[in-house]
C-alpha cells in the first residue's frame, strides 16, 4: 500500500499480536490515542514500557490526547511527567459539535475550520505529514464535498420524520 499512497493509516487493536507488531515495525509514526482517565493512563504506561523494551525510538510514538480539556481533575502536565512522554496533540472535547457534524454528513474541519477541534486536526495533520495546514487556501479548507449539502438536507428531512414518528 505504501507504494500506492503517500500516507497509510492503520487502526490496530490494543494488543501486541504479531500483526500489530509487524504494523508497528513498518510504521513511520505510532499515534497512541489516550484520554485522561486513570485506566487509560495506566494502559499507556504499560504500552510505553513494552515499546521501550522493543527498542522503538521514543520519538516514533506520539501521544494524542482525545477529549482534551475535559474536566476530571487530572492535569496533562502530571500525566506527561508520569509517562515520561509529552502529549504531541490534544483533540478538543466538543460532543455536540461532533454529533452535529456526523448527523449533517460534513466533517467539522470543512464546515467549521476555526473550531477548536478542527484546529487540533490540522495540528495533527502537520505533525505526521509535510502538509503546511497554516497555508491552506480558504477554498480548500471550506469547500463542501460533492453532495454534502444535499446529504445534510436529506438527513434533516429524515430526522424530522423520525421526530414526528416518535411523538
Task: Show the residue positions of the predicted features.
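Inter-motif core of Ras-like GTPase G domains
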Residues: 2-6, 16-38
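Short glycine-/polar-rich loops that comprise or flank the Walker A/P-loop
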Residues: 27-29, 56-61, 84-87
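G-domain G4 guanine-recognition motif of GTPases
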Residues: 34-35, 61-73, 90-96, 111-113
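Amphipathic alpha-helical transducer elements in NTP-driven molecular machines
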Residues: 38-41, 45, 73-76, 95, ...
